[in-house]
Amino acid sequence: TRQFIFRARYVMLCTNGYSLLVEPFFKDKVIPTRGQVMVTEPLAERPMPTCGYSHYGYMYYRSTFDNRLLIGGARHLHKASENDTTEDRPNHAVQGSLDDYRARFFPDVTAPVARRWAGIMGFSADGLPIAGTLPDKPRVGFAVGFTGHGLSLGAGTAKRAVERLLNGTHAGAVDVDRFVAVVD
């Protein structure tokens, strides 16, 4: 978008893991972290009737609507390469750990892997999303730092961020004020 100039009364940054690339304010607040996933070809029957987590949430699995096994996680085994990065291509070492997990916990699932991918998440410094406006730009709001839970926390956090931007309403537990010294 460097070719164009956009004008707006208000701007909302919903940049999550890429926040620091857009605004230096997020330097000590949002850490880009790569998440990785693999999914098999369709299976004759569903390997698990539900989704699940293990290894304290660092590994997860679920069956897809078309009977594929999806496994993700393993970043706890590769912290140096997975934390503080915006590289969004799969890492072979992490993908190998996902394969090892499948072999150990789902030994009967022998279907080939159909796809592997990675994506960047924004982890906040304290584990909660962050909503607010930039201290030096009160017409620029943001909802970032979902710490891997953007689907479940995104809509509510965005609503609070918009209310903060338009009305100055405090965003509660997710308000940026917890990171910024407030001077009266």
Give residue ranges: language-model regions.
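Flavin-dependent oxidoreductases
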Residues: 1-69
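Active-site proximal loops enriched in glycine and acidic residues that flank catalytic Cys/His/Asp
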Residues: 10, 15-16, 42, 73-75, ...
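Structural motif
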Residues: 10, 37, 112, 139-141
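Short, well-ordered loop/turn and helix-capping segments at boundaries between secondary-structure elements
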Residues: 17, 45, 119, 163, ...
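Short glycine-/acidic-enriched loop or helix-start segments at secondary-structure transitions
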Residues: 22-24, 81, 152-153
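Short, hydrophobic/amphipathic alpha-helical packing segments
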Residues: 34, 95-99, 151, 155
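Active-site lid/adjacent beta-loop-alpha segment flanking the redox-cofactor pocket in flavoenzymes
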Residues: 45-139
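C-terminal lid/capping helical subdomain adjacent to the catalytic/cofactor pocket in oxidative enzymes
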Residues: 134-184
